Amino acid sequence: APMEPVYPGDNATPEQMAQYAAELRRYINMLTRPRY
């Protein structure tokens, strides 16, 4: 199973938040991908 991205914290930089958001979206896509 893919690793869940770690929340960078409330005082993270916008770049860190954007990176986290992108990783989280990819993680969720991997979890919800249908397995035929």
From Swiss-Prot:
Hormone secreted by pancreatic cells that acts as a regulator of pancreatic and gastrointestinal functions probably by signaling through the G protein-coupled receptor NPY4R2. It is found in: Secreted. The modification Tyrosine amide is found at Y36. InterPro entries: Pancreatic_hormone-like (IPR001955), Pancreatic_hormone-like_CS (IPR020392). GO terms for biological process: feeding behavior; neuropeptide signaling pathway. Keywords: Amidation, Hormone, Secreted. Its main location: secreted. Belongs to the NPY family. It holds the Pfam family Hormone_3. PROSITE patterns: PANCREATIC_HORMONE_1 (PS00265), PANCREATIC_HORMONE_2 (PS50276). This is Pancreatic polypeptide. One of its GO terms (cellular component) is extracellular space.
